[in-house]
Regions:
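Short, small-residue-biased leader/transition segments that mark boundaries at the very start
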Residues: 3-6
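ABC ATPase "signature
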Residues: 44-45
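Short, charged/small-residue-rich alpha-helical element at the C-terminal edge
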Residues: 56-136
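Walker A (P-loop) phosphate-binding loop of ABC-type ATPase nucleotide-binding domains
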Residues: 206-210
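Helix-to-loop junction immediately C-terminal to a conserved catalytic motif
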Residues: 219
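Conserved ABC transporter NBD signature motif
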Residues: 227-231
Length: 231
């Protein structure tokens, strides 16, 4: 799978891989995570560092006999003063409290059921950050913006970004009349493009346009039917 291949590229080829995802379990596989919402960077660090933002705030509760976990989840989420998030998991409901006092309140409400403390994970840290973001009425002047992150990368010796990559004349990726067929179905049809050194490039298109198939061929995970590619 791609998840198995990426660490190999990083280790064997000394590559830096930038992954964008909405799935926290995928982000947990990365060495560094940048958490974003509405185009704004909320925080950044290792998955372990971000998970610690929810330390001592994560619990699981067993629903009373005859109560569906989804119903218990809904009840918890209605208590927005005490609960930041709640999700069904393995027949129980995992939830995040807003404060130590909130846990005392929850214990009183659900005194007849079992509640256990659990370790926090990246998704929990994200929910804490998102809750803080939503509760802010005024934004700090010290807030981190995408432009700040770009400036950090631009100054770094590990990543050189040219204002006009095409001036370098060095082509890192080249695709000419690339075709990939699955039986009678054409997934990629005569696609051509070039990516110059230092250029940030992406493919946009609806589902089924051939984006993933194209990148799989570029990564050597899938042979092309015809055409030329070099990466």
């Amino acid at each position: 799978s791609l998840h198995d291949a990426l660490p190999i590229f990083v280790e064997d080829e000394s590559l830096t891989v930038l992954v964008t995802t909405t799935y926290m379990e995928e982000a947990e596989l990365c060495q560094k995570v940048i958490v974003m919402h509405n185009g704004e960077i909320l925080s950044q660090g290792t998955p372990e560092e971000l998970s610690l933002k929810a330390k001592d705030k994560c619990f699981v509760i067993k629903p009373p006999i005859g109560i569906n976990p989804r119903i218990l989840q809904a009840r918890l989420l209605d208590d927005s003063h005490n609960i930041i998030d709640a999700i069904p998991e393995g027949g129980e409901v995992r939830f995040i409290i807003s404060s130590p006092e909130a846990f005392k309140n929850i214990k009183k409400i659900y005194s007849s059921v079992q509640i256990d403390k659990i370790d926090s994970r990246l998704e929990d840290g994200f929910m804490i950050l998102l809750n803080e973001y939503k509760n802010k009425n005024e934004y700090s002047e010290n807030k981190i913006y995408i432009s700040n992150l770009y400036n950090e990368f631009e100054k770094s010796n590990t990543l050189e970004i040219s204002n006009n990559p095409k001036k370098s004349k060095e082509i890192d990726i080249e695709v000419v009349n690339l075709v990939r067929k699955f039986g009678d179905f054409t997934a990629v049809s005569n696609t051509s493009f070039q990516v110059y050194s230092g250029e940030i490039f992406g493919l946009l298109g609806p589902n089924g346009a051939g984006k993933t198939t194209t990148f799989r061929m570029l990564c050597g995970l899938l042979p092309s039917t015809s055409g030329f590619l070099r990466s």
